């Protein structure tokens, strides 16, 4: 793996900090979520999925090898 550039992606995950309180007659007031346009295309969306698949590959392969030996 020498000579291969390493890339680091930072992922931001929204966390709700305020608790919605019931208003009149016990109803909760919800905000309508607006769709945001995806910046950067599909690559930032696919990178974590690809990384997870690469990380899971050795485990899947070892299970397949053990199953084939039985």
Swiss-Prot record:
Its main location: virion. The record marks 26-27, 41-42 as: Cleavage. Keywords: DNA-binding, Late protein, Virion. GO terms for cellular component: viral nucleocapsid. Residues 1-26, 42-70 form a propeptide. It is found in: Virion. It comes from the Viruses. GO terms for molecular function: DNA binding. The role of the precursor might be to condense the viral prochromatin for encapsidation by virtue of the two basic domains. Belongs to the adenoviridae pX family. This is Late L2 mu core protein. The lineage of its organism: Viruses, Varidnaviria, Bamfordvirae, Preplasmiviricota, Tectiliviricetes. The gene is PX.
């Amino acid at each position: 793996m020498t000579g291969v550039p390493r890339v680091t992606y930072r992922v931001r995950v929204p966390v709700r900090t305020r608790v919605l309180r019931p208003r009149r007659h016990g109803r909760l007031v919800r905000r309508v979520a607006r769709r945001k346009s995806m910046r950067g295309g599909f690559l930032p969306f696919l990178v974590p999925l690809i990384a997870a698949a690469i990380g899971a590959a050795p485990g899947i392969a070892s299970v397949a090898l053990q199953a084939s030996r039985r």
